[in-house]
């Protein structure tokens, strides 16, 4: 990583408060070039606390943009960080509406020339898309990274009509803990306590809402832009990663938005900005977005719109591993999407009917739903999962050409089941001559009728000669998929079943990117001790109770531990998620998350702690949720609340 210290403009920054129409003020940090000439503004609008949680990331990029002639602005969302108001539902209308108000406010500043761009990662990129759909006049361009256009089936809540257990639970539990964090008295003064209590009294676990909407209803339709791409008037640069669950958003946006104001990039990365991308190779993401901003906000000829509509990373075959520093492969470009370079090729399944009755712990080697460069975030060798699945192999001839795919594979499966409900999960794997099985992509569908047709997530991969293309079909996938009641597997008939692969013809491509660079880091320090290595909890640990037939997955999200900030803050985060299931009981799954967050300013003194617990279980008719929040200041418990709720299983 190149650290840049010299820029075309000298810069400065200040913290400001942005008023909204309802009287709420939002906390913001503005980096500006030192010039008397008004410049375009760039907005990153996020709930993730600009004075601590995203501060290291913010300092890597906002001063960089300011040094290139932009007012780069980071705003805490309503009810988060040092902003006023109550934390809200990310899929409600308030968040993009607030974003539109902020855009209008920025456009009216004397240092802004009236043109605004908006950028975001994950939820923040999704909010940028939704804000663009409101079409605020000053908003001319958007960069959405690892974001979703479809919060129902293209996010962390449902997959193929089934509850995404690890996504639903982990996100709801994390957001409950994060929403309970207080404002910082260094920035809001003595008002922090009253602001915090008001915030806490207004909290409600989001799992209540998400489990109450188990089908694609109006709640989910309003929460994304997929229902009306035409509402977006700004130019959109959509960016995704092969190991991020939101990568298909890029494919849909480049297909449905006008070609003169959309471009897409899908790299090898997980859920993070591509200049920090793991697996690599990382790219010069800041330079690439600068080309986007300069073209759409300054009218400069950067050549960005002469790039292919979609630039994609196609991975070369590689051994399975839970973490990769860098993957082999190459960049390709397609001028339209769907691309004439991609031809659907059908592979018919062969053999007699096969009974598929996977044990409920099938899926423990799925990897994280949303990996972000963790040591153990990616799927390891799939041989154990394949052993619990019906596998259909298609050899690539040793003396033939490689099979290169780009796009979304599709499966058609003829299934019979005596159970009233169930799921089918399909995985596409690259099997090496030594038997190692590397996961390429996957998908799932709730059972209904006899023929089941569904797409897998988008992939870019090369199967080399001598390898096998494997379709693995299972009836369980915990903890990704929450089992349906009475799920008992199915019979798969290869007659009438097929795998359709999007085969891309090999072209001479010249897609290149600059090497990554950033501005100077903030200087956050992480204290270490000699016994850190011995006491650090594994990121992913699988525990089997042989006598009880019970399996437990324990995960520890990163980062964890204590971080010291230059402004004197000490922030400590510790969390543990557990996913438990009995191998033969579809009603046995349960999830549990515990968080402890401590914010400490020794010089004030200020010392607050947030402890949360979130759990989900089920019976045949209901989901059973339990959540608890305890907040202390010093030794005083300021807030303690428990929520218990039964939610009918209407579809999940």
Regions found by a protein language model. Name each.
Residues 58-59, 67, 133-231:
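Accessory cap/linker subdomain of secreted extracellular hydrolases
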Residues 120-130:
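Glycine-rich nucleophile elbow surrounding the catalytic serine of serine-hydrolase chemistry
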């Amino acid at each position: 990583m190149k650290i840049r210290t010299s820029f075309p403009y000298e810069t400065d920054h200040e913290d400001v408060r942005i008023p909204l129409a309802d009287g709420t003020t939002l906390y913001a940090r503005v980096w500006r070039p030192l010039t008397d000439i008004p410049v375009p503004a760039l907005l990153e609008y996020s709930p993730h606390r600009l004075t601590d949680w995203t501060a290291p990331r913010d300092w890597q990029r906002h001063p960089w943009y300011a040094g290139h002639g932009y007012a780069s602005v980071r705003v805490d969302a309503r009810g988060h960080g040092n902003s006023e108001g109550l934390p809200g539902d990310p899929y409600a209308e308030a968040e993009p509406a607030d974003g539109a108000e902020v855009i209008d406010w920025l456009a009216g500043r004397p240092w802004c020339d009236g043109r605004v761009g908006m950028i975001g990662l994950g939820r923040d990129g999704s909010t940028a898309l939704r804000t663009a759909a409101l079409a605020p006049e000053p908003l001319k361009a958007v960069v959405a990274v690892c974001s979703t256009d479809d919060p129902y089936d293209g996010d962390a809540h449902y997959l193929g009509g089934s509850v995404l257990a690890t996504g639903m639970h982990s996100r709801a539990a994390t957001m409950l803990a994060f929403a309970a964090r207080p404002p910082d008295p260094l920035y809001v003064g003595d008002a922090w306590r009253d602001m915090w209590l008001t915030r806490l009294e207004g909290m409600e676990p989001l799992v209540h809402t998400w489990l109450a909407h188990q089908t694609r209803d109006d709640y989910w339709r309003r929460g994304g832009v997929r229902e009306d791409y035409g509402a977006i008037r700004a130019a959109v640069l959509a960016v995704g990663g092969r190991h991020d669950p939101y990568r298909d958003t890029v494919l849909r946006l480049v297909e449905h938005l006008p070609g003169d104001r959309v471009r897409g990039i899908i790299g090898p990365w997980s859920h993070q900005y591509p200049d920090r991308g793991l697996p690599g190779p990382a790219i010069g993401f800041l330079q690439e977005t600068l080309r986007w901003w300069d073209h759409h906000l300054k009218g400069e000829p950067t050549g960005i719109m002469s790039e292919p509509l979609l630039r994609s990373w196609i991975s070369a075959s590689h051994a399975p591993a839970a973490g990769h520093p860098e993957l082999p492969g190459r960049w390709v470009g397609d001028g339209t999407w769907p691309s004439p370079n991609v031809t659907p090729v059908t592979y018919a399944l062969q053999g007699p009917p096969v009974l598929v009755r996977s044990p409920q712990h099938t899926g423990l080697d799925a990897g994280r739903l949303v990996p972000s460069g963790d040591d153990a975030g990616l799927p390891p060798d799939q041989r154990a999962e394949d052993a619990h699945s019906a596998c259909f192999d298609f050899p690539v001839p040793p003396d033939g050409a490689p099979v290169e795919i780009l796009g979304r594979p599709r499966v058609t499966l003829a299934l019979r089941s005596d159970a009233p409900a169930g799921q089918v999960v399909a995985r596409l794997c690259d099997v090496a001559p030594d038997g190692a099985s590397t996961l390429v992509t996957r998908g799932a569908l709730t059972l209904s009728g006899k023929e089941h047709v569904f797409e897998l997530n988008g992939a870019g991969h090369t199967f080399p000669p001598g390898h096998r293309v494997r379709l693995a079909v299972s009836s369980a996938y915990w903890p990704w998929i929450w089992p349906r009641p009475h799920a008992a597997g199915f019979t798969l008939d290869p007659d009438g079943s097929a795998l359709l692969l999007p085969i891309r013809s090999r072209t001479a491509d010249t897609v290149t990117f600059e090497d990554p660079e950033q501005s100077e880091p903030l200087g956050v320090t992480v204290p270490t001790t000699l016994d850190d290595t011995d006491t650090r909890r594994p990121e992913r640990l699988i525990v089997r109770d042989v006598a009880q037939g019970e399996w437990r997955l324990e995960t520890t999200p990163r980062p964890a531990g204590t971080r010291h900030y230059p402004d004197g803050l000490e922030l400590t985060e510790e969390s543990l998620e557990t996913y438990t299931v009995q191998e033969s009981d579809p009603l046995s799954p349960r999830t549990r998350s515990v968080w402890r967050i401590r914010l400490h300013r020794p010089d004030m003194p200020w010392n607050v702690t947030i402890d949360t617990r979130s759990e989900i279980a089920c019976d045949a008719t209901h989901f059973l949720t339990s959540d608890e929040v305890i907040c202390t200041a010093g030794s005083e418990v300021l807030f303690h609340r428990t929520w218990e709720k039964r939610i009918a299983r209407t579809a999940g």
